[in-house]
Curated annotation (Swiss-Prot):
One of its GO terms (molecular function) is initiator methionyl aminopeptidase activity. Substrate binds at residues 78, 176. This is Methionine aminopeptidase. Pfam families: Peptidase_M24. Monomer. Binds 2 divalent metal cations per subunit. Has a high-affinity and a low affinity metal-binding site. The true nature of the physiological cofactor is under debate. The enzyme is active with cobalt, zinc, manganese or divalent iron ions. Most likely, methionine aminopeptidases function as mononuclear Fe(2+)-metalloproteases under physiological conditions, and the catalytically relevant metal-binding site has been assigned to the histidine-containing high-affinity site.
Length: 253
């Protein structure tokens, strides 16, 4: 399937969705603390999104039961909010999407709950810094596979490994569109192959970072994804548009 090119009008609509996504995440960032349950946070985000005349994009998507993916400690993505109460030393990944007038925004971040270990601090910094490094490297005409190679290099040079089998993606009138953008260069694939980045494209980059092994395992809830190493993980994501031959973050907080 071809990668869609968005018109200026569509990018304006996607910017609106992205801004609301960022506002919802910023709300959660302010409210995350020891003593708060995951379900309380999920309700805060859902209430805010609905009060803004928008729809939580993840609720019901592929059957997901909640508005926010909340990935605790070793869970890297797709964690389901529960009545678990956050404790000092936890890390929590928050990934949410918003639909506004038929257009989608998508963003994620991983946050410390109070004081965390030095290793977890490095882990959280890795996914955030790798994301921002990749965004700053985007040029019109480069291959998406080059972007995957850049993401992998940024992750591994910080001493970590990317999660395998899951990836960034295009976004627009659907929450997941072409292309798929892995956080690593697949075996046997050349960086200078495949589709190129063009003006008007909109897509999500989302480094998912593991400590020792990138092979995934899906837990019994059939949603939560962990590394087979069982160690803590981290995830950051932004929606990006190519406007004026440069990358513009639509979900900047």
């Amino acid at each position: 399937m071809a990668i869609s090119i968005k018109s200026p009008k569509e990018i304006k609509a996607l910017r609106k969705a992205g801004e609301l996504t960022a506002q919802a995440l910023a709300l959660l960032e302010r409210e995350v603390r020891p003593g708060v349950s995951l379900l309380e946070l999920d309700k805060m985000a859902e209430d805010f999104i609905k009060s803004s005349h928008a729809r939580p994009a993840f609720k019901g998507l592929y059957g997901f039961p909640n508005s926010v993916c909340m990935s605790l400690n070793e869970v890297v993505i797709h964690g389901i909010p529960t009545d678990y109460v956050l404790q000092e030393g936890d890390i929590i990944g928050l990934d949410l999407g918003v639909e506004v007038d038929g257009y989608y925004g998508d963003s994620a971040l991983t946050l410390p709950i109070g004081a965390i270990s030095p290793q977890d601090e490095k882990l959280l910094a890795c996914s955030k810094e790798s994301l921002m490094h990749a965004i700053s490297s985007i040029r019109v005409g480069m291959h998406f596979k080059e972007l995957s190679q850049i993401l992998e290099g940024a992750i591994t040079e910080r001493g970590f490994v990317p999660l395998k089998g899951f990836c960034g993606h295009g976004i627009g009138k659907k929450p997941h569109e072409e292309p798929e953008i892995p956080n690593y260069l697949e075996k046997g694939v050349k960086a200078n192959s495949g589709p190129k980045i063009k003006e008007g494209m909109v897509f999500c980059l989302e480094p998912m970072v593991c400590q020792k092994q990138g092979e995934p395992k899906i837990l019994a809830d059939k949603w939560s994804v962990v590394s087979v190493d069982g160690l803590n993980t981290s995830h950051h994501e932004h929606t990006i548009a190519i406007v004026g031959n440069k990358a513009v973050i639509l979900t900047e907080r």
